[in-house]
């Protein structure tokens, strides 16, 4: 019985396969990048923040509203104890909150109070206050579809910045801090719109 010689793919076939794989990779990267950019878009940019009045997580008998926060900028950070990315970004958020550049308000979303309190006890509480929206109804007005999500609201109640996803130190330094500086230096000027990349 004679063995037929093994045939190896021709260089032309290998080049074609590699070309197709590279094309698929480029298309995937482009689609993912455009989806990421679209996911950060917020119809609220440059507009008044939605009204809210929600109970405090630590004392549900007390409520806090957007009018209580008016007059100075604040960062509204949407999180949940069930959110793995929220736990990952917690040290970055804590470090930023310690700088006291802006009030950091926690927005506990679609969570059980007991779980949220335990999470803050274990990972630390960087927030000046934490509001609770266990049903997620108020978050609809903000366009929240995932946690973590972060909004920067200026002293006039205008949404100046929005980011869906975990914050990192580079984003804080290169995106958030320049917008805060802009707000601090021109609190009555017309707001510039900023979107996370």
Swiss-Prot record:
Residues 33-197 are periplasmic. SUPFAM superfamilies: Thioredoxin-like. One of its GO terms (cellular component) is plasma membrane. Keywords: Cell inner membrane, Cell membrane, Cytochrome c-type biogenesis, Disulfide bond, Membrane, Redox-active center, Transmembrane, Transmembrane helix. One of its GO terms (biological process) is cytochrome complex assembly. Residues 43-181 form the Thioredoxin domain. Disulfide bonds join 83-86. Residues 1-11 are cytoplasmic. It holds the Pfam family Redoxin. The chain crosses the membrane at residues 12-32. GO terms for molecular function: disulfide oxidoreductase activity. InterPro entries: Periplasmic_diS_OxRdtase_DsbE, Redoxin, Thioredoxin-like_sf, Thioredoxin_CS, Thioredoxin_domain, Thioredoxin_ResA/DsbE_sf. It is found in: Cell inner membrane. It is a single-pass membrane protein. Involved in disulfide bond formation. Catalyzes a late, reductive step in the assembly of periplasmic c-type cytochromes, probably the reduction of disulfide bonds of the apocytochrome c to allow covalent linkage with the heme. Possible subunit of a heme lyase. Belongs to the thioredoxin family. DsbE subfamily. PANTHER family: THIOL:DISULFIDE INTERCHANGE PROTEIN DSBE (PTHR42852:SF6). This is Thiol:disulfide interchange protein DsbE. It comes from Xylella fastidiosa (strain Temecula1 / ATCC 700964). The lineage of its organism: Bacteria, Pseudomonadati, Pseudomonadota, Gammaproteobacteria, Lysobacterales. The gene is dsbE.
């Amino acid at each position: 019985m004679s063995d037929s010689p093994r045939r190896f793919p021709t260089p032309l076939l290998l080049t074609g396969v590699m070309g197709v794989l590279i094309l698929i990779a480029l298309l995937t990267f482009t689609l993912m990048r455009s989806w990421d950019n679209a996911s950060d878009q917020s119809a609220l940019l440059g507009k008044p923040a939605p009204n809210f009045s929600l109970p405090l997580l630590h004392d549900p008998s007390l409520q806090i509203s957007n009018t209580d926060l008016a007059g100075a900028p604040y960062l509204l950070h949407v999180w949940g104890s069930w959110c793995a990315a929220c736990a990952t970004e917690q040290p970055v958020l804590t470090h930023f909150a310690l700088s006291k550049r802006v009030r950091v308000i926690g927005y506990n979303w679609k969570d059980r109070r007991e779980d949220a309190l335990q999470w803050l006890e274990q990972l630390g509480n960087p927030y000046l206050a934490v509001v609770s929206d266990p049903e997620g109804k108020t978050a609809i007005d903000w366009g929240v579809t995932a946690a973590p999500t972060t909004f920067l609201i200026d002293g006039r109640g205008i949404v100046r910045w929005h980011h869906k996803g975990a914050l990192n130190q580079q984003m804080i330094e290169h995106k958030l801090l320049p917008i805060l500086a802009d707000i601090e230096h021109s609190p009555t000027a017309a707001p510039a719109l900023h979107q996370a990349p």
